Amino acid sequence: MSDAQQITLIVDGEETKVTTGTTGAELFFERRDVVVARVNGELKDLDQPLPEGADIEGVTIDSPDGLNVLRHSTAHVMAQAVQQLRPDAKLGIGPYITDGFYFDFDVAEPFTPEDLKALEKMMLKIINQNQKFVRRVVSEDEAREAMKNEPYKLELLGKKNNAADAGEGVNVEVGAGDITIYDNVDRKSGDSVWCDLCRGPHLPNTKLISNAFALTRSSAAYWLGNQNNQQLQRIYGTAWPTKDALKAYQERIAEAERRDHRKLGAELDLFSFPDELGSGLPVFHPKGGIIRKAMEDYSRQRHVDAGYDFVYTPHITKGHLYEVSGHLDWYKEGMFPAMHIDAELNEDGTVRKPGQDYYLKPMNCPMHNLIFRSRGRSYRELPLRLFEFGSVYRYEKSGVVHGLTRVRGMTQDDAHIYCTREQMKDELTTTLNFVLGLLKDYGLDDFYLELSTKNEDKFVGDDATWDEATRTLAEVAEASGLELIPDPGGAAFYGPKISVQAKDALGRTWQMSTIQLDFNLPERFELEFQAADGTRQRPVMIHRALFGSVERFMGVLTEHYAGAFPAWLAPVQVVGIPVAEAFNDYMFDVVDQLKAVGIRAEVDISSDRFPKKIRTASKDKIPFVLIAGGEDAEAGAVSFRFRDGSQDNGVPVAEAVQRIVEAVRNRTS
């Protein structure tokens, strides 16, 4: 074989010579777990020839990218099954998502649970046929001919040149570069039995999907995520490399459903979502109010200790404030409509005094800037750390509102820090350490950081300032010792940010705190301080939300603890259960001693039998149950019963009180 017939590749870091035209499938023939190739950083189907000098990496089915390909291919098989069972179904979009996939369909009747079972059977039949996924590059005319009976696909072809901004999931189907169609090809006849407009890549064949998949639910969804468009039916599913992995995922989902904060909120009488108030507007019941107050009180004290100044701002403002801040230019769709008020009319109906537009506050930062600007500021006052539990209102679409974690009315634990450029690095370091320490106090301790950097097409300020700020944030993040994940181009237009990602008890990731530099608002509000040399200078502005919102954080903690809050947060910390009515007075005396030292305690004097009272305390997830009978009363003692069912008998009352006080003070249990 001559050199002319060979090309050189870098395969998994090593130089390799192969025959011209070699495909990924041939290169990784002996590695059955490789399902696509990463070629110069881009994922490619295994049947594509590899170019000279390319850097090649085999992507396995159990890797993050491999799982995405598996799920995308399973979505295609599901769509094929739908059109076999419902030939009138029109195809929408079908991307992979976290842990699964979905596909949208325009159908006459919504899908039922029985339909999903029938679809799973049809999918297994397709999978066992070992159909090949074959990529085909086509012209736009050829694509339109192939998709002539698919109106939504024809619409997507018209969006090819602006796919990134065209709507939900469009760039999975079309985008820059070639137009491609993927055929599902019958292994025996070689004929295409189904096809879809898609950018890929896909598995080599359907057999690799095996039986480790499941269709999980169906729901309504608007075409391209726009509520003004046609309503379609969406089927969700999941797929994994093995049946064991699928089972483990299903067990995690079942546990997540048991921990769902909406379910626990009702069971534990913490909060509710009355229809009379509207979507995304929760109310907190007395027990939920206790938890929320304990969360806020602890945070408030920690902020005082860290040198923050508390401020309060109103819920509404004249619209001009958000013209100055730019929110009406950049964020109006996320705001509630204006209230036009204060107009005065003459008797004949003519306007004597024009009215003004007022808005519900979506952000606290413009008002905090007014506080900073309310008088002259000196460098000696900096850093100035303003903090507020500020109520804000955002017009979230009803389809994305979800329990406490996505609401329309929320309370942000919002801080804005003003400092000199020389103070910026130390202040960012202090802020990040403060954030991580406080989150740990609430029971979250598994973190990584994400650094969002400049979007080259959408930013204010100069490159040098952005570069310095980004470099400083990166240094601060790296010094924390936590994993740092880059988010290229993910920053808001006004500055780079660090976001703290926290994992809960189920291993799910939640974005918690953000630390955001802002080059925009100090300019817009003309914020200044007098520097040591007498000149007027702009302060560096740092936005910092620790919980995100109190509501969202409470939802996260409810699921993290499965409703079994640590004693310091629990609405009822102790329940006393006398073994018989004769010992009620004794138990009331014990509970009074606990109340005297600030413990939330009560006695169960219901008519229920003793075993039922124990079960009730367990169901209500009470941290400590104190039990007293004759021997306890004579000895001045109680029996401790813990959440795990273990029990410590004959504990002197004074010791019991001290144990509970220490557990609450130390935020344990």
Curated annotation (Swiss-Prot):
Its EC number is 6.1.1.3. One of its GO terms (cellular component) is cytoplasm. Its cofactor is Zn(2+). The keyword Transmembrane does not apply. GO terms for biological process: threonyl-tRNA aminoacylation. Homodimer. This is Threonine--tRNA ligase. It comes from Arthrobacter sp. (strain FB24).
